């Protein structure tokens, strides 16, 4: 891990909701000179989401100390074929079973398939399948305070790249102490490609759900012999991280 060279960074976050239900979220870690670009882009994104216009949109900007930021490489990327959800789910179980037991792999998949309107991720013990996040069940754990290195940032765009944004988030998640895997299915009803991460590899899998399905969420699997939930959650939610190698 390298420390970022001197710049003035800010963390920008957006959360949009209606009647208490999550609609959209986005965030980045950027040089302060680009803050207005991203604030405007995130506000537009919140108001053009496929789930409809939100009742409440919250934009937050926070200055980050340069000395606190670390830089890590992006995960390697691999794609697996699947023609329909049942085949995609078999691929997920097979990949997860390389790092946890088949029973825990099944539990993790079942958990993400039953997630609805989560603002964050569900944290599960990689040995027992027990849920470890201590918050409101609809909040979960928020992987936060991350972005790409300045030379790789193409700037904000209204038409977001699901792949690039997911790769950046997953790269931070897998750098957290004790995290051995992640499963994600987008909560965007029109986007059906999901991913699983294991052993420093981001594995894209199409057709993780039927088109316009309300399914959507993410699960992190934690090896509690390596790190406590408290330490891992602190890193995921608070440690500023820049990702390099995102094309």
Swiss-Prot record:
Any single GO BP term: biotin biosynthetic process
Catalytic activity: heptanedioate + ATP + CoA = 6-carboxyhexanoyl-CoA + AMP + diphosphate
GO MF: 6-carboxyhexanoate-CoA ligase activity; ATP binding; magnesium ion binding
Biological pathway: Metabolic intermediate metabolism; pimeloyl-CoA biosynthesis; pimeloyl-CoA from pimelate: step 1/1
Claim: Magnesium is one of the keywords in the record: yes
Cofactor: Mg(2+)
The protein's Enzyme Commission number: 6.2.1.14
InterPro entries: BioW
UniProt entry keywords in alphabetical sequence: ATP-binding, Biotin biosynthesis, Ligase, Magnesium, Nucleotide-binding
Keyword Magnesium: yes
Function: Catalyzes the transformation of pimelate into pimeloyl-CoA with concomitant hydrolysis of ATP to AMP.
Subunit: Homodimer.
Protein family (similarity comment): Belongs to the BioW family.
Record's protein name: 6-carboxyhexanoate--CoA ligase
Annotated gene: bioW
